Design a protein with these regions (language model features):
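Short helix-boundary/capping micro-motifs
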Residues: 11-26
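Short alpha-helical elements of helix-turn-helix
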Residues: 1-15, 33, 62-65
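Short helix-loop hinge/linker segments at domain boundaries
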Residues: 53-55, 73-84
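Alpha-helical residues within the helix-turn-helix
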Residues: 23-24, 41, 62
Length: 84
């Protein structure tokens, strides 16, 4: 499990789709799906209920989502500080 996978999970949740998160990161939908699946396996918990048209957070996903959002913002702040 990598911090960037948690950030990617946060983006999927925020954007509501694998496709939009893939476009944001210049990667394919299948890469997003694979990384989220690997994150779920590492945590031994399903994070998302997936259908062909929608995503919904599981209870474990809800718990991770709030922490993941903080991690995403802290990471972005660190990057911005370095660039300044």
């Amino acid at each position: 499990m990598h911090a960037n996978d948690i950030v990617l999970f946060s983006q999927v949740v925020e954007l509501g789709s694998f496709k939009k998160a893939a476009e944001l990161n210049n990667i394919t939908n299948s890469v997003v799906s694979k990384r989220i699946t690997q994150l779920e396996q590492a945590l031994n918990a399903q994070l998302l209920y997936r259908t062909t048209r929608s995503l919904a957070l599981t209870e474990a996903g809800k718990k991770l989502a709030s922490s993941a959002d903080m991690i995403k913002h802290i990471t972005q702040e660190a990057i911005d500080d370095i660039k300044d």
